[in-house]
Amino acid sequence: MVVTKIIIRCLFLLAILVSPLAQADAIDDIVERGTLRVGIAEFVPWAMPAKRGGHVGYDVDIGVKIARDMGVRAEFKVYEWKDIIPALEAGEVDMIAGGIVITPERALRITFTDPVALSGAGMATNTHMTREVENLQQLNDSDIVIATVTNTYSEGVARSIFDKAEIHSHSNKNDAETEILEGRAHAYISSLPAVQFLVANNSDAIDLPLSEPIVGWAEALAVQKGEQELLNFLDAWITAHKADRWLDATREYWFESRDWMQEVKR
């Protein structure tokens, strides 16, 4: 009995000693490696192929800034959206950049930082195919096809609000956008900024029936479960750069201007 108590006490003390070291592993690995591995997916204007190679966008600027503040360089790994959370869980990346929507379901698998920004779901419609549609309720019909991207929050919005419509989920935004542009879908639901840019670039064929989000949401960064030290650093980073308005200025550049369009590969 005495031996058992001694063993239990030793294990308890060992857990106390090891725990801080285990929590610091992610940051230690990043610093020792010299790179912060950032998971991104291609959505306008979060991450887009650049003319000079690599990617540009809001998420890219965030990843680069975080890495510089850590004294390392950013290494971007591009995934289809459905694969980005599994990549984080598998340890292929250290974090997911700022376009991921906070949901309770996702929080069971990954850990979110404090919110980086607020946004919401928007809808683009094919002008010719919806010329007789007068309200959103008319789009909730079995004859209506709505395009989305698999495993995005927007897909859930589409299936929830337009439960009678035929929902076509695509592995990437290019395929989803092509479907509405080619007249094979009546509407496309994605983040409001993404559909706004799609409409701006295709105003002869695509319309924006609503200027406000269908549903609002909060966006954050994400890390693996249990990486408390990295989470603490990122929360502090968000607080600091909200205070100095770097985050506001960066979001204004990517979401409210078009100055960056010359950087994007066509």
Where do the PLM segments sit?
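A ligand-binding cleft/hinge motif common to bilobed small-molecule-binding domains
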Residues: 83, 99-108, 157-160, 181-182, ...
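Extracytoplasmic small-molecule ligand-binding "clamshell" domains
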Residues: 24-100, 108, 169
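Flexible hinge/capping segments at coil-to-helix
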Residues: 126-144
